[in-house]
C-alpha cells in the first residue's frame, strides 16, 4: 500500500499538521521533507550557550530547538526553520500563547537572536555548510533577525552576524577570543566554551 504525499499550502497548515511521529520537518514548496534529529553534541552546545545567556535574559525567552520560525521561502528553501537556539523578543511568549503554538510567524517581530550549530562537513560545497552559512543566513537576514550566530565545530570558529542597515556584517571568533554580541554586549564567553561538547 502506498501512502499519499502530504500537501500543505501554508505555514499555518504546517503548524496544524501532526503525524504522531514526533519528527522534524521542513516545508518546501508545499511538501514535507523530514530532517534528521540534532546530534547530542549540537544540543549540548546549544544548552551551554543557554546557560551563559540566562544571566542576561529571562530563561523562558531562550528556546533550544523545537521552536518554528516562519521565514521567506526562496526557491528550493523551506518556509520554516528550527534553530538550535532562539532568544525571543519581548512579547513573543504572550503572542505564542495567543496562537497556541511554539512558533514565530511573519506578522510577529523577529527573534532577537538565533544560533545554529553546523553539523560536520568536509567541504564548503556540502549541504551542512551551505544550509547554515548561505541559506539560513539569507533567510534570517530577510527576516531581519538582529543577530545570527553560526557555531562551527569543524572550522573551530563562531561567526557572529549582526544586522546593519538590512545586511549582515560578520565577525569570526576562535579559541580564547571573547565573542562580541551586539544584542548582549555584557555577555562574556569564549569561542572555546561555545565550541566544546
What are these regions (language model features)?
Residues 1-197:
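Gly/Pro/Ser/Thr-rich low-complexity, intrinsically disordered segments predominantly at protein N-termini
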Amino acid at each position: 500500500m502506498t501512502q499519499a504525499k502530504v500537501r500543505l499550502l501554508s505555514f499555518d497548515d504546517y503548524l496544524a499538521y501532526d503525524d504522531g511521529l514526533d519528527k522534524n520537518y521542513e516545508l518546501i514548496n508545499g511538501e514535507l521533507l523530514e530532517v534528521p534529529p540534532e546530534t547530542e553534541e549540537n544540543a549540548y552546545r546549544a544548552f551551554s550557550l543557554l546557560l551563559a545567556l540566562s544571566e542576561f535574559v529571562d530563561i523562558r525567552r531562550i528556546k533550544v530547538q523545537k521552536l518554528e520560525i516562519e521565514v521567506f521561502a526562496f526557491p528550493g528553501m523551506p518556509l520554516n526553520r528550527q534553530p538550535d537556539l532562539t532568544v525571543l523578543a519581548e512579547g513573543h511568549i504572550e503572542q505564542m500563547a495567543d496562537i497556541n503554538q511554539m512558533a514565530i510567524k511573519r506578522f510577529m517581530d523577529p527573534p532577537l537572536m538565533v544560533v545554529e550549530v553546523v553539523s560536520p562537513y568536509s567541504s564548503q560545497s556540502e549541504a551542512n555548510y551551505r544550509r547554515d552559512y548561505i541559506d539560513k543566513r539569507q533567510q534570517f537576514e530577510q527576516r531581519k533577525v538582529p543577530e545570527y550566530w553560526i557555531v562551527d565545530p569543524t572550522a573551530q570558529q563562531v561567526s557572529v552576524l549582526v544586522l546593519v542597515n538590512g545586511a549582515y556584517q560578520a565577525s569570526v571568533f576562535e579559541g580564547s577570543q571573547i565573542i562580541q554580541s551586539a544584542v548582549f554586549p555584557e555577555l562574556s564567553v569564549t569561542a572555546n566554551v561555545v565550541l566544546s561538547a
